Amino acid sequence: MKFLAFALETNRWKKINGDYRMKKYLGGCHCGKVQYEVELNLKNAISCNCSICMKRGSLLDFIPESQFKLLCGENELQDYLFNKKLIHHYFCKNCGILSFGKGIAPGGTKEVVAINLRCLEGINLKTITIKEYDGKSR
């Protein structure tokens, strides 16, 4: 849960500093069976060193569920839970790409979506500030 708190605090920081330009992006898996639309600010990403994030090489941003829309592939998703079973890691059954996950924000009331920014179309990762998170020690 500390990871989600860190991610949400990063979003609050963006709002406080007035740098919260929202834009819609399309994303999905490699084979195209899972596709979604997200609305977010691409200023910051989180690189976590926990076991699953290190193995899959994700760069993450967390958004409220209201800013996420699954366009197709709901039946193509496999859910993977581990450790405390708080975050649903969804991956495509066909190509294996994990392009997003869902979990409950700290406080237990709002669902947030973790977007793997590497799965979004038309973005330049070189323009994004990457913030390190020590999930390995949690």
Model-derived features: positions:
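A short Gly-Trp-Pro
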Residues: 13-28, 33-138
